A protein has these predicted regions:
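Histidine-acidic metal/acid-base catalytic patches
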Residues: 4-12, 16-19, 23-34, 40-56, ...
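Active-site acidic/histidine proton-transfer and metal-coordination neighborhood
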Residues: 10-11, 16, 62, 82, ...
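Active-site mouth loops of central-metabolism enzymes
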Residues: 34-46, 94-101, 133
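Active-site beta-loop-alpha junctions enriched in small/polar residues
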Residues: 38-40, 66-70, 95-98, 125-127, ...
Length: 280
């Protein structure tokens, strides 16, 4: 079944009459909740082992690694040991776009398998590349090529949205161009719901339009003026509605991300508690 389980309740019209089924939706909570380690990047720089232990103690089951930060100075083997020690899973990592066109792309895919990644996700394109529709097209084609190699290794390549991806170039929204030009059988998408809102987009509309493309999610709340993110439940993003709209959600990584909290570990704890208690 999709995301929700259903049960049938029956009532008799009269004794001995036909029984009429009535389908009743059962409220759902997330089985697993991940944390994007960018949310606690300073703590990870200072003491990655202690930080991962704290993240697990909060109740998080998954983390999203940051290859783009060099995994905070640790080798893939060290990261693997740390994850196993804490009982954490790392379904994905954020990687720099240049890794797709490097000569050792296959080596990166092998490392992804070592770390248990299902996805390598590019968070954004180089600044100079994102100002031109032609460069967006070029990168979409590179994603298709790199994605084909990734699929042969059992890994998915994916793309994450930033607020400025929604800023039109001429009459075209570059994010839309990228989604339309990439091959769904080779490239998946990670929806950052807060970034979508801050960029002026509607996460629900994109979920409806590309429901089969989104396989990973950043849950992020946003202040009413859309100036920055905030703790979950303190902004105006309808997270419950979004979660309820995601098909097969228990099969898809869902991460908390808050980019600039005053106390990152305290906010991570509050965000987990909020999301873990949410019925949808």
């Amino acid at each position: 079944m999709d995301r929700r389980d259903f049960v049938y309740s029956f009532s008799a019209f009269v004794a001995g009459s036909w029984l009429v089924p009535r389908r009743v939706s059962i409220a759902t909570r997330l089985d697993r909740i991940g944390l994007e380690l960018y949310s606690v990047r300073d703590a990870m720089r200072a003491d990655p082992e202690r930080t991962l232990a704290a993240v697990r103690a909060m109740g998080y089951t998954d983390v999203e690694l940051l290859w783009s930060f060099g995994n905070f100075g640790r080798t893939p083997q060290q990261v693997r040991v740390s994850l196993d020690k804490e009982g954490l899973r790392a379904p994905s990592a954020h990687v720099a776009p240049e890794i797709l066109i490097a000569a050792d792309w296959q080596k990166s895919l092998d490392t992804a398998k070592l770390l248990g990644h299902d996805y390598l996700i590019v968070p954004s394109l180089p600044a100079d590349a994102s100002r031109s529709l032609d460069r967006w097209r070029d990168w979409a084609d590179r994603f298709n090529t790199a994605g084909a190699t990734a699929r042969k290794s059992g890994v998915w390549l994916a793309f994450h949205n930033e607020p400025d991806h929604m800023k039109p170039i001429g009459a075209t929204i570059p994010y839309d161009l990228f989604v339309e030009r990439t091959d769904p059988s080779l490239v998946r998408l990670q929806l950052d719901v807060g970034n979508m809102v801050m960029g002026g987009g509607d996460p629900m509309q994109y979920l409806e339009r590309h429901r089969d493309r989104y396989w990973s999610f950043h849950m992020k709340d946003v202040l009413p003026d859309r100036s920055r993110d905030t703790e979950l439940g303190k902004g105006n993003v309808d997270l419950r509605r979004i979660l309820a709209a995601i098909p097969n959600i228990q099969r898809k990584p869902v991460y908390v991300e808050q980019e600039g909290p005053a106390d990152p570990l305290a906010s991570a704890r509050l965000n987990h508690a909020f999301l873990a208690s949410m019925n949808f």
